[in-house]
Amino acid sequence: MTKEFHHVTVLLHETIDMLDVKPDGIYVDATLGGAGHSEYLLSKLSEKGHLYAFDQDQNAIDNAQKRLAPYIEKGMVTFIKDNFRHLQARLREAGVQEIDGICYDLGVSSPQLDQRERGFSYKKDAPLDMRMNQDASLTAYEVVNHYDYHDLVRIFFKYGEDKFSKQIARKIEQAREVKPIETTTELAEIIKSAKPAKELKKKGHPAKQIFQAIRIEVNDELGAADESIQQAMDMLALDGRISVITFHSLEDRLTKQLFKEASTVEVPKGLPFIPDDLKPKMELVARKPILPSAEELEANNRSHSAKLRVARKIHK
């Protein structure tokens, strides 16, 4: 049975309006989720335009088929159930050589967080899972119970940026020697027990960063985003645009770096002109990230950490 997707879209108008949508264009929503961005983008297209929507979660696609039904009936939407790291290959299979714009809403979606059984939330007791793609083999249970101490420390530092990574990894190691760690609540309590009392008084849940780290590892989120964004920039037509929403510093740092590399050029000083093959292929549409308005922040608590970066294709 399909579970309803209740998802408040973040930076809805900013993300799509910044794409400067052409009514007859070909567009991609790389992270379908609750289909809010897709629905608004489709409202700007004529019947000659087309949207390709990616999601590896069948539940998201099932719900989007209801929400976007009027556009589906007009033949304006193609759903692709796959990880967006396969963006270029899947679009080529569909006969698409270039696109006019693409948007990303990175990270875990609200419905995935809210569905207890998915095991993403440290606030709800559930089996350790955290897979965005339910067909994938690696789960949070595998990471927590089978990764050795050094690998746990590595992912906690790298993806969670938690200064107590070593202490937490050691506590996990000790706990699983007694019995496997099976639920989100068990893990959250172990993490909590590894932190000093003064840390527990700080704002925010003590398990937040570690849960983020495990989720990123399970889904290879940063690796997939890196590959996909580069493919997207390659596939953009001239004047095509890419919008990327991020929710934590690791995603934002990655996006900023990819855009910087694509929009700058390293040439010797005094060179009279820049050869075509060295010209930057992108330019930043906004120098600084676009943040949610005060109204949105008040209406949607989950928008607080959101940042939007936008770039435009200027050279093939």
UniProtKB/Swiss-Prot annotation:
Highest taxon of source: Bacteria
The keyword S-adenosyl-L-methionine is annotated on this UniProt entry: yes
Sites where the protein binds S-adenosyl-L-methionine: A35, G36, H37, D55, F84, D105, Q112
Record-linked Gene3D superfamilies: Putative methyltransferase TM0872, insert domain (1.10.150.170), Vaccinia Virus protein VP39 (3.40.50.150)
Key word rRNA processing present: yes
Reactions catalysed according to its record: cytidine(1402) in 16S rRNA + S-adenosyl-L-methionine = N(4)-methylcytidine(1402) in 16S rRNA + S-adenosyl-L-homocysteine + H(+)
One GO cellular component term: cytoplasm
Entry keyword set: Cytoplasm, Methyltransferase, rRNA processing, S-adenosyl-L-methionine, Transferase
Pfam families in the cross-refs: Methyltransf_5 (PF01795)
InterPro entries, per database record: RsmH (IPR002903), SAM-dep_MeTrfase_MraW_recog (IPR023397), SAM-dependent_MTases_sf (IPR029063)
GO molecular function ontology, one term from the record: rRNA (cytosine-N4-)-methyltransferase activity
Main localization of the protein described in the UniProt heading: cytoplasm
One annotated GO biological process: rRNA base methylation
Location(s), subcellular: Cytoplasm
E.C. number(s) listed in UniProt: 2.1.1.199
Family matches, as NCBIfam families: 16S rRNA (cytosine(1402)-N(4))-methyltransferase RsmH
HAMAP family found in the cross-reference section: 16SrRNA_methyltr_H
Family the UniProt entry places it in: Belongs to the methyltransferase superfamily. RsmH family.
Role according to the record: Specifically methylates the N4 position of cytidine in position 1402 (C1402) of 16S rRNA.
UniProt-recorded name of the protein: Ribosomal RNA small subunit methyltransferase H
Source organism: Streptococcus pneumoniae (strain Taiwan19F-14)
Lineage: Bacteria, Bacillati, Bacillota, Bacilli, Lactobacillales
Gene from which the chain derives: rsmH
